[in-house]
C-alpha cells in the first residue's frame, strides 16, 4: 500500500477537504499534527513514506531531508509555491513536486476583517463590553481614506475592489505593476 504522510496539520484541515476513508483502499495515510523535534526526528518518522503532503512552509524540505528519505517519490504542497522545498534536491532525486489550487478569497476576507477591526477598535470595544461598557470609543470612517497595497495580483485586486466598495482611494505598488489592471480597478499606481 502506498504510504502518505500529511505534515504539520495543526488545524486538522486535511480531513475537511479530502475524504481519507474513501482513499484508504489504495493509500495509507498518517497525519502529523505536531512539528518534528528536529530534522533527524523528521527523517526517522518519515523514512517509510512515498509521498509527503505538506502544509505551507512549516517543515522545511531541505536537501538533507530529501536525500535521507529513500522511498520518497512525491511532495505535494498546499498552494502553488513553497519556498521551503529544495527543488534542486528533488530534481536530482527525481521526486515529483506539485502544488494545489489556491483559494484566494480567505486572504482578502481576513485582510478586511483586520482593517475593520483596527478602524473600529474591535479589541478595545470587546474588552470593554465584557466589563459592562458599551461603545466607549469612536472608530474611523473608511470612506475617503487612502488604502495602499503592495501588489495588485489576484489577492491584491480583491482587496482593492472591497476598498473601492467602501469609497476608499486605492493606490498600489509593485515591481511589475500592470497599468491596465490599475485602470480597470480604478487604482492609482504608486
Segments the model singles out, each with a brief description of its role:
Residues 137-190:
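Rossmann-like dinucleotide/phosphate-binding beta-alpha-beta segment
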Residues 17-23, 67, 85-92, 177-185:
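Short loop/helix-cap segments at secondary-structure boundaries that form the rim of catalytic
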Residues 17, 36-40, 58-63, 84, ...:
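Structural motif corresponding to alpha-helix initiation and N-cap regions
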Residues 1-51, 55-56:
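N-terminal glycine-/charge-rich "phosphate-binding" loop or analogous flexible N-terminal tail
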Residues 1, 72, 143-146:
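Phosphate-coordination loops involved in phosphoryl transfer and adenosine-cofactor binding
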Residues 49-126, 130, 139-140:
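Phosphate/diphosphate ligand-binding glycine-rich loop within oxidoreductases
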Residues 7-9, 34, 80, 152, ...:
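Cofactor-binding loop segments of dinucleotide-utilizing enzymes, especially the Rossmann-like FAD-
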Residues 29, 96-97, 170, 189:
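Hydrophobic beta-strand scaffold residues
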